[in-house]
A protein has these predicted regions:
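Active-site neighborhoods and metal-handling regions in enzymes and metal-associated proteins
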Residues: 1-457
Length: 457
């Protein structure tokens, strides 16, 4: 833990902008044309983009429409107006999407026992959109697989597609067009999308900061979660907050259990484009920690912070995912730390789009990528965990200038975070790295002292 210490630090009050940046309406048509070009290069003559409530990011990225209560499916040909299949409840909402679409009411996407008397069979709708014998159909849901014939859509849709194209056609997984970790269309973001993500990170990180400032023994989990101040924006994952024995599982929702002094504690708050997470113990000092883990900071938090600080410092355009993985392996490779997921991944409207980080990865980081600092120890011991999960983006000189010009207030917040990380925490960032979180790598292991954080300064 050389160079790492606990210190009292004053977090800058960066705040949350009142208005959320919006994408220009024409951006959706531009994205569709970009996807059409990639589809043609890959040999597809039709694309099918499927969405349900949890997996709507691809569809929302392309159309500005995400289904509520039911599923939806976009059919995209090489030219013409895209077609959208929706159930009963999304009919009106799809018609108001920023991307003009030809709507088809497909009532099997509706909830159970709702009317199903006003839609054509799926095969007729798809055939009417140009899918037939010999068609080469690319299918997008939310996962790419090593085998292109593996498709995560409901079987009845895939069966119908394969029946329509016949033995001379093909139906294959095309998710890489949007989410390939090196150059997927949804992996490389423009300035307006990054500004939206910065706003989202202001919301989630300020919420977690407010929670840490108001955390106290006796507060129920269900009361504590209200401190996050969720503003109604669509969530990128369910809200997580647990204390005590249940916190071990990490992913659970809050209960009515009162939070007790000495509890282990974790919370995560994510909306489209951002997620912020912190974890530690509900104490003010090491003397209040549970028996046997008085060295919690030295054994776990200090090495973890040193690893994440080096990971941050290694970020720049052109860096490889394999190098980032090697940093974490060198610091936290001991089985005690229990690191088993990719140490870092890309994010978008969905919390985890893909990851360029794995052992030996030669995928290079690029300008426009939005990344999540997601490095989570799972010790499986009384030491529990620690977490410093925040969002950043990578931007070359041109994109940085564009952001500073178009969104000067966001740029000022980014510069304030960079100064805080360098001056207060001792984390020097490459100019390419834009921190989006108002917590800006602040890691308090003793959660009743949110001003007492790890630092290299």
């Amino acid at each position: 833990m050389t160079g790492v210490r606990l210190a009292t630090v004053e977090l800058p009050d960066i705040g949350v902008p009142v208005e959320r940046p919006e994408l220009p309406v024409e951006r959706y048509a531009e994205r569709v044309e970009g996807l059409r070009a990639r589809a043609a290069e890959a040999g597809f003559d039709r694309l099918v983009v499927y969405a349900d409530r949890e997996h709507s990011a691809n569809l929302s990225f392309l159309t500005g429409f995400d289904p509520r209560f039911e599923e939806a499916m976009l059919v995209l040909g090489p030219t013409g107006t895209p077609a959208i299949l929706v159930g009963n409840e999304c009919w009106g909402m799809a018609g108001a999407a920023p991307l003009p679409m030809e709507r088809h009411r497909y009532q099997d996407f509706s909830l159970p026992s709702q009317p199903r008397d006003r839609s054509l069979p799926l095969s007729e709708i798809l055939a009417g959109e140009g899918i037939g014998r010999g068609s080469r159909v690319g299918v997008l849901g939310w996962k790419a697989y090593d085998r292109p014939d593996r498709i995560e859509l409901p079987a009845y849709i895939v069966d119908e597609l394969r029946e329509l194209v016949g033995p001379t056609g093909s139906v294959t997984n095309a998710n890489a067009l949007l989410i390939d970790p090196a150059d997927g269309l949804r992996i490389i973001n423009d300035v307006d999308q990054l500004a939206m993500f910065e706003w989202a990170s202001c919301v989630t990180s300020s919420g977690v900061r407010r929670l840490l400032g108001g955390l106290r023994p006796g507060l129920r989990e269900s009361e504590a979660v209200g401190l996050l101040g969720w503003n109604g924006m669509p969530l990128s994952c369910h809200v997580m907050l647990t204390a005590g024995p249940r916190a071990t599982f990490g992913l659970l929702s809050p209960s009515d259990r009162p939070i007790e002094r000495g509890d282990q504690f974790t919370t995560a708050f994510g909306i489209w484009g951002a997620l912020t997470c912190r974890a530690g113990f509900v104490v003010e000092e090491a003397a209040e920690l549970p028996d046997g883990i008085g060295d919690y900071v030295d054994r776990l938090v200090g090495p973890y912070f040193a690893a994440v600080a080096e990971w941050y410092g290694a970020l720049h355009i052109g860096q490889t995912g394999g190098t980032l993985q090697a940093i974490i392996d060198r610091h936290l490779g001991d089985p005690f730390f229990g690191i088993f997921l990719n140490p870092g991944h890309q994010l978008h409207l969905d919390e985890w789009v893909n990851s360029p980080v794995w052992p030996g990865s030669t995928v290079e980081l690029r300008s426009g990528m939005a990344m999540q600092v997601d490095i989570i120890p799972a010790t499986g011991t009384p030491y529990f965990t620690t977490n410093i999960e925040d969002g950043i983006a990578l931007a070359d000189e041109t994109l940085r200038a564009e952001l500073a010009t178009a969104y000067p207030e966001a740029w000022a917040r980014i510069e304030a975070r960079r100064r805080f990380m360098a001056d207060a925490l001792g984390i020097d960032l490459h100019p390419d790295v834009l921190p989006f979180s108002n917590l800006a790598a602040a890691l308090p292991p003793f959660l009743l002292r949110p001003d007492l954080v790890m630092t290299l300064a």
